[in-house]
């Protein structure tokens, strides 16, 4: 329709379909006078005369010769109207097809309730066909023939194929839409073309002739498809990195050679090929039990801050813009430079810990717990990234590096249950950093620690290296302390060092200490002529060359791996309630180290058992029974004997007085703020006890012919002379006797005879128990005699004889082994 300033023109004709369309009034004209009805008031003039009446906008039609209605357009005003109201009337650009509205003058107030009805054909007004055809991509295809001398490929080939199929020439390219007023054929009837029984009378409202795609539509579709290929890589679930070609070839070769596996359980079958984390595409080593709709995708996108997993790159991009958790939940207990360690309780942050376990299962095959995270505590290692110069963000980002978890309560002194370092952060020393941090927490708790068995392949290799380096560090520390005090001591004696001393200095259990000493090739055993008792077997630490130990430690230190600093730790042991952090009741068993901690004043007190809890519960139950008897006896006073004393109910304050409260007061005592009172005092006490012990004369170890390296080979029947020439699975080799004799002065003696306090080393034994073997042999003989008496049949006798022969052979074999006195220090990894 047209908006003009001629009041004499008739009103426009109403449109049946668009009669209810209403838009806001953005068109103002000072030439439209008020109507007698006065339905809508457009504006009120400020500081105007009373004689000037309010003007009302009217939709009128001007001269047909000047203002013709164009299809899909809003006609312009007449020249006279445009000259008088150049600022207030709509400005229309025929070429661009755009409508620009004027700026409202400050002296005009527009009513908020005013609405203007503009009636137009939406299909003609929003002519998308015209807009697309004028674009820079479609216009050359419509106006120019695409031909080339060479063979056509890709998009051009598809376009020419369409032209040949439709049999169209370049010069005859016109829009082939047929008119809506095309007459019907003779055999057509009105019922087939007028739907709903003639309810919609106009043909343009129900005609479907323009819905069929034409050759121009197909060309446009192909053009848009060609231009949107780049967006499919960005927004699609496809890989954007060039991975190693050799790995891909090996996988393809395995697929061709191997048979296609049958999928028995489709729910647990994972099709995940890569995990996107921090703009890295990481190939998982093992399958993880993600939800079924996640495992059906080839790419999984994981946020490095909240560990939320997604299957769409676009969703992942939008999540990165909106995610505000730039650090893990929980408490930050350690910070040294850019490294931080966070403590997270599995009961408080269940969703985060579950996502963490699902991510860890992609790289740890032995992990079995994914959703039951309440009994565990997680320690997250992060790298801090400062964003001070960022215009929209000032908070620092903490990138996820790795983690380790441990149980809140365990009776085996496990300080680590699961450990993971992401592949993009490996070979940087973060794995050993987490291991050392776990031992630091164990030393703060005044107990030894060890990882939970069995270990994975990478975990076992990393722990062996860690134990080796820690033992080398302790030996060098003992050497330096011995040299400082060598002036006051006799040089003809050796220092007495027990495995328990090294365990206290490192926080490791004695078994792990033996592993480390074997890796350093310094643990030897001595075999005397007498085989009467276990006292004939002594174990010593023989250092062939201190330069070799120093080179091992310096080689590792030269890599500049991060080290744990004790003074950066702000943490105290967690005080667990009766449920130990979970919803179950467990019984605490006292350990030797806990008893030692209770008797030692410098060590933190440890709650060794739950006797207070049992006494408290028993007293409450006893008082309840007493009240019930009193009620049943109709409030009669009971006669109490002199010896019959009823203990009063224990209040809650007395219950917590000797357990939790005293432990809390001890932990909150920060008088010594210079260094950690527990760790440094424990090391100082151990070193002083070593120096105060009586030395062993060198004459006792003058002969060096019977000293051998301790091996981990089990059930070996080779002669003792050949043991020195063999190597075990941990890479331990024998040393020549000349090298040992040259460096006798640097020996550290370890053995049962060298213990000043025998109770310290009773928990760790390296010898076989002969009494247990004798008892087991007697039991076997009794079982054999019982079987001979009970078997009456010939088959039974024959079986009994065969068993007797086997038992005799095994008994002879055991005697041979006992004569050779093969002592197994450490069992194999598989066992």
UniProtKB/Swiss-Prot annotation:
Compositionally biased region (Basic and acidic residues): 795-812
Region (Disordered): 614-639, 719-813
Domain MYST-type HAT: 267-573
GO molecular function, one term: histone acetyltransferase activity
Stated consequence of mutating residue 303 to A: Greatly diminishes HAT activity
InterPro entries linked to this entry: Acyl_CoA_acyltransferase, HAT_MYST-type, MYST_HAT, WH-like_DNA-bd_sf, Zf-MYST
Modified residues annotated as N6-acetyllysine in this record: 367
UniProt zinc finger (C2HC MYST-type) residues: 300-325
UniProt main location, coarse: nucleus
Subcellular compartments: Nucleus
Gene3D superfamilies: 3.40.630.30, N-acetyl transferase-like, Winged helix-like DNA-binding domain superfamily/Winged helix DNA-binding domain
Entry function: Catalytic component of the NuA3 histone acetyltransferase complex, that acetylates H3K14. The NuA3 HAT complex has 2 functionally distinct forms. NuA3a binds H3K4me3, through the PHD finger of YNG1, and acetylates H3K14 at the promoter region of actively transcribed genes to promote transcription initiation. NuA3b binds H3K36me3 at the coding regions of actively transcribed genes, through the PWWP domain of PDP3, and coordinates transcription elongation. In vitro, SAS3 acetylates free histones H3 and H4. It is involved in silencing the HMR locus.
Family assignment from sequence similarity: Belongs to the MYST (SAS/MOZ) family.
Designated name of the protein: Histone acetyltransferase SAS3
Origin species: Saccharomyces cerevisiae (strain ATCC 204508 / S288c) (Baker's yeast)
Organism ancestry: Eukaryota, Fungi, Dikarya, Ascomycota, Saccharomycotina
């Amino acid at each position: 329709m047209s908006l003009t300033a001629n009041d004499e023109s008739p009103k426009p004709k109403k449109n049946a379909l668009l009669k209810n369309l209403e838009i806001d009034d953005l068109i103002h004209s000072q030439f439209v006078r008020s109507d007698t009805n006065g339905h809508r008031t457009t504006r009120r003039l400020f500081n105007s005369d009373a004689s000037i009446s309010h003007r009302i906008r009217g939709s009128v039609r001007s001269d047909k010769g000047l203002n013709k209605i164009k299809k899909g357009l809003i006609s312009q005003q007449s020249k006279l109207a445009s000259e008088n109201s150049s600022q207030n009337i709509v400005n229309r650009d025929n070429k661009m097809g755009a409508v620009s509205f004027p700026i409202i003058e400050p002296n005009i107030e527009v009513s908020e309730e005013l609405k203007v009805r503009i009636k137009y054909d939406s299909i003609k007004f929003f002519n998308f066909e015209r807009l697309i055809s004028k674009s820079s991509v479609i216009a050359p295809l419509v106006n120019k023939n695409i031909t080339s001398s060479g063979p056509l490929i890709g998009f051009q080939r598809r376009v020419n194929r369409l032209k040949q199929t439709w049999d169209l020439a370049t010069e005859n390219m016109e829009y082939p839409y047929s008119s809506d007023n095309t007459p019907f054929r003779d055999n057509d009837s009105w019922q087939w073309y007028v739907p709903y029984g003639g309810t919609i009378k106009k043909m343009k409202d129900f005609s479907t002739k323009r819905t069929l795609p034409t050759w121009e539509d197909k060309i446009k579709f192909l053009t848009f498809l060609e231009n949107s290929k780049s967006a499919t890589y960005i927004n699609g679930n496809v890989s954007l990195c060039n991975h190693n070609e050799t790995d891909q070839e090996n996988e393809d070769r395995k697929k061709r050679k191997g048979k296609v596996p049958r999928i028995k359980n489709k729910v647990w079958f994972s099709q995940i090929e890569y995990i996107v984390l921090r703009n890295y595409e990481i190939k998982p080593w093992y399958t993880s039990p993600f939800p079924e709709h996640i495992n059906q995708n080839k790419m999984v996108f994981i946020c490095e801050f909240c560990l939320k997993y997604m299957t769409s790159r676009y969703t992942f991009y939008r999540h990165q813009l909106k995610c505000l958790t730039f650090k893990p939940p929980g408490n930050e207990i350690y910070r040294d430079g850019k490294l931080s360690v966070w403590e997270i309780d599995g009961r408080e942050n269940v969703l985060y810990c579950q996502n963490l376990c699902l991510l860890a299962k992609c790289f740890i095959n032995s992990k079995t717990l994914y959703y039951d995270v309440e009994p565990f505590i997680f320690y997250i290692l992060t790298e801090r990234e400062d964003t001070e110069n960022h215009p929209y963000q000032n908070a620092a980002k903490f990138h996820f590096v790795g983690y380790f978890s441990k149980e809140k309560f365990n009776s085996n002194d496990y300080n680590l249950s699961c450990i993971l370092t992401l592949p993009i952060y490996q070979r940087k020393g973060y794995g050993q950093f987490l291991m050392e941090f776990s031992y630091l927490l164990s030393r703060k708790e005044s107990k030894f620690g060890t990882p939970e068995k069995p270990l994975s392949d990478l975990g076992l290799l990393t722990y062996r290296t860690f134990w080796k380096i820690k033992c080398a560090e302790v030996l060098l520390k003992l050497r330096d302390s011995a040299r400082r005090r060598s002036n006051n001591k006799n040089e003809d004696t050796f220092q007495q060092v027990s495995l328990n001393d090294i365990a206290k200095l490192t926080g490791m259990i004695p078994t792990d200490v033996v592993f480390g000493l074997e890796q350093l090739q310094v643990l030897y055993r001595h075999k005397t002529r007498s085989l009467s008792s276990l006292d004939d077997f002594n174990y010593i630490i023989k250092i062939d060359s201190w330069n070799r130990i120093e080179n091992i430690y310096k080689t590792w230190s030269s890599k500049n791996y991060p080290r744990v600093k004790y003074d950066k730790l702000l943490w105290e042991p967690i005080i667990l309630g009766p449920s130990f952090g979970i919803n179950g009741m467990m019984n605490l068993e006292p350990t030797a180290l806990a008893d030692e901690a209770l008797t030692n004043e410098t060590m933190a007190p440890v709650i060794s058992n739950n006797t207070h809890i049992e006494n408290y519960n028993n007293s409450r139950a006893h008082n309840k029974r007493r009240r019930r008897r009193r009620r049943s006896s109709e409030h009669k006073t009971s006669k109490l004997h002199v010896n019959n004393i009823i203990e009063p109910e224990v209040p809650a304050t007395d219950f917590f007085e000797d357990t939790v409260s005293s432990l809390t007061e001890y932990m909150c005592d920060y008088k010594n703020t210079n260094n950690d009172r527990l760790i440094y005092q424990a090391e100082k006490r151990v070193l002083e006890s070593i120096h105060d012990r009586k030395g062993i004369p060198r004459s006792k170890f003058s002969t060096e012919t019977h000293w051998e390296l301790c091996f981990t080979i089990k059930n070996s029947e080779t002669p003792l002379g050949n043991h020195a020439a063999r190597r075990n699975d941990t890479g331990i080799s024998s040393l020549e006797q000349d090298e040992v004799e040259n460096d006798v002065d640097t020996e550290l003696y370890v053995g049962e005879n060298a213990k000043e306090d025998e109770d310290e080393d009773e928990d760790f034994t390296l010898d076989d128990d002969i009494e247990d073997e004798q008892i087991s042999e007697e039991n076997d003989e009794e079982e054999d005699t019982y079987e001979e008496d009970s078997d009456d049949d010939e088959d039974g006798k024959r079986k009994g004889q065969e068993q007797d022969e086997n038992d005799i052979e095994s008994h002879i074999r055991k005697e041979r082994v006992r004569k050779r006195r093969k002592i197994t220090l450490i069992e194999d990894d598989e066992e």
